[in-house]
Each structure stands twice: as C-alpha cells, then as structure tokens.
UniProtKB/Swiss-Prot annotation:
GO molecular function: 4 iron, 4 sulfur cluster binding; 4-hydroxy-3-methylbut-2-enyl diphosphate reductase activity; metal ion binding
Species name: Erwinia tasmaniensis (strain DSM 17950 / CFBP 7177 / CIP 109463 / NCPPB 4357 / Et1/99)
Role according to the record: Catalyzes the conversion of 1-hydroxy-2-methyl-2-(E)-butenyl 4-diphosphate (HMBPP) into a mixture of isopentenyl diphosphate (IPP) and dimethylallyl diphosphate (DMAPP). Acts in the terminal step of the DOXP/MEP pathway for isoprenoid precursor biosynthesis.
Name of the protein described by the UniProt record: 4-hydroxy-3-methylbut-2-enyl diphosphate reductase
Annotated metabolic or biological route of this protein: Isoprenoid biosynthesis; dimethylallyl diphosphate biosynthesis; dimethylallyl diphosphate from (2E)-4-hydroxy-3-methylbutenyl diphosphate: step 1/1; Isoprenoid biosynthesis; isopentenyl diphosphate biosynthesis via DXP pathway; isopentenyl diphosphate from 1-deoxy-D-xylulose 5-phosphate: step 6/6
Gene label: ispH
Alphabetical keyword list: 4Fe-4S, Iron, Iron-sulfur, Isoprene biosynthesis, Metal-binding, Oxidoreductase
C-alpha cells in the first residue's frame, strides 16, 4: 500500500503565530494564561496547551482581574474587545490571524461608510461571529449567507450600495458559486480587492485535489470543529474518494485501508505535523510502504508575534 502526502499540509502562518503567542506568554508570565475560545481548532494542540497552564474560556467574565488574556486566532467582535479592555487585566494579547484581521478591516470600513456588507461564511463559527461584530452602523446593515439559495431570500436596504467579504477558511469552489449568485442578484455589489479566502486554505484545497487523483482513500488529519479541515474532506469526497476526517492515528479503522493500493494523507491548517507522522506510522503497521511527498506550492509566510512577547512587557492601556 502506497502512502502519498499532500503538499502543503498542516500548520499555516496564522496558526503557528497563535500557538507561539500562548506558548511565549506561558514562558514569560507563567500559568495560568487565559485564552478566549480554543486558540486554534485542534484537540491535540488545545490539550497540550491546557496541560502547560492555558485556561480556555468563552466569556470574558470568566477571567479573574489581574489575569493575562489572549484572543484566539479566529478573532473577536468589537464588543468582546471593548469588554476585555474595560477589565482590570494585566495584559491582553491578540492572536487573531492577520488575514482574519484584513477581513475585519474591510467590514469596519464598510460600517464607517454606511455600505451594507454581506459576509459569506458558516453561521456559528467564531471567525464569522467576530467578523460580523465589526459592523456597528445602524444606518447600514450586515448580513450572512452560506449558500446560493440564501442570496435569493436576502433583503437589503440599498442594492446599489453593497459589498461582500468571506470567511477565510471556506471551500474555494462553493464560495465562487455564492459570489456568482451575489453578482447576479446585485450587479453593483463590490468585492474585496484581494480574495478573502486565505492562501493556506487555497493551497491545501489545491493539494488535496492533486492527492485525490491517485489516492483511493484520503485521510484528513484535523478536528471536527476545524472549518478548513472539513472542507478538505469534502473536496476528497467530491472527487469520488473515501475520505475520513481524523483527530489522530487512533481513529484509523483497518477496514478503511484493507485491500487499498494507495492512501493519501493531508492535514488541516491547525493540525501539527506530529499527528501526521503518527498516522504514517499507523499506516505502515497496516501494510503501508514509505510515504511519498507530493510536489506542491511552497509556503514561506511568517507572521510575527506581538513585540511585547519578543522584547518587553507593556501594560494594557
């Protein structure tokens, strides 16, 4: 049984930065460090940080006065940010992915101008909640759509003054269909100057398409609440392949790979490489041969951690 590895796969720059922020805060200030929401959507990462003293919470009022708080990579609304700044916290660090912040700025700009904004995204996802929460102009409006059918039912105030943006971890193909529906219904709608779906999401989806050409089965390493990991599994399924989203090697069922000639392995943007290596080891135990790395798009983007975690401590304003 051949093992093929998608390339690129695993950690993106935003995830790497977010995890580094929590790790460095723990090193510099010691436990406990409070983090609003899971810093990234991966069970292994969250459990590892929890063991080191990170405490993951959902509401700001769960954080004691004098504590250190970190916002997750998914970003937060203006209301949550204001609530945190009003608290007597020692330090506040923002691990929001810079590419999510880019979308936040697009929404905030639309809000200032009074332009109605339509976000393409998944309801209930923390990134979507944070992005929607950047709009606060009652004269305008902020709307969420997930699929083309939502566009047909959407009622806006002014069809001539509309813009749209997207969640960063969506399916490129599905999002294109929704954008086509928006442009058909609202011909004057304006989109972002640069695609909101991030480079890592796009690259990993492109890589899984390549992987699915040769693999009979595709294993996607990623947690169930990881948006980008779910999209990878869906893409492989659409290619007609058996696809499974797994948290770890322990989830692999022997029946999935029995009699299979080629297994493809990829990982979502929040899944660490150690999990991929454990999956390869398990597949080898089930009859796999040495894993072959496919040729893919090179990624060399790095997002720096806040300067306070590089140089000196700065008190929260």
């Amino acid at each position: 049984m051949q093992i093929l590895l998608a390339n690129p796969r695993g950690f993106c720059a935003g995830v790497d930065r977010a995890i580094s922020i929590v790790e460095r805060a723990l090193e510099m200030y010691g436990a406990p460090i409070y983090v609003r929401h899971e810093v990234v959507h991966n069970r292994y990462v969250v459990n590892s940080l929890r063991e080191r003293g990170a405490i993951f919470i959902e509401e700001i009022d769960e954080v004691p006065d004098g504590s250190i708080l970190i916002f997750s990579a998914h970003g937060v609304s203006q209301a949550v940010r204001a609530e945190a700044k009003a608290r007597a916290l020692t330090m506040l660090f923002d691990a929001t992915c810079p590419l999510v912040t880019k979308v936040h700025m697009e929404v905030a700009r639309a809000s200032r101008k009074g332009t109605e904004a339509i976000l393409i995204g998944h309801a209930g996802h923390p990134e979507v909640e944070g992005t929607m929460g950047q709009y606060n102009n009652p004269q305008g409006g902020m709307y969420l759509v997930e699929q083309p059918g939502d566009v047909q039912n959407l009622q806006v105030k002014d069809e001539d003054n509309l813009c749209f943006m997207t969640q960063t971890t969506l399916s490129v193909d599905d999002t294109s269909d929704v954008i086509d529906a928006l442009r058909a219904r609202f011909p004057k709608i304006v989109g972002p100057r640069k695609d909101d779906i991030c480079y890592a999401t796009t690259n990993r989806q492109e890589a899984v398409r390549t992987l699915a050409r040769d693999a009979d089965v595709v294993l996607v390493v990623g947690s169930k609440n990881s948006s980008n990991s779910n999209r990878l599994a869906e893409l492989a399924q659409r290619a007609g392949k058996l696809a499974r989203l797994i948290d770890s090697a322990e989830d692999i069922q022997e029946a999935w790979v029995k009699g299979v000639s080629c297994v493809g392995v990829t990982a979502g943007a929040s899944a660490p490489d150690i999990l991929v290596q454990q999956v390869i080891q398990r597949l080898n135990e089930l009859g796999g041969v040495d894993a072959v790395e496919l040729i893919g798009r090179e990624e060399n983007i790095i997002f720096e951690v806040p300067k306070e975690l590089r140089v000196e401590v700065k008190q929260l304003d």
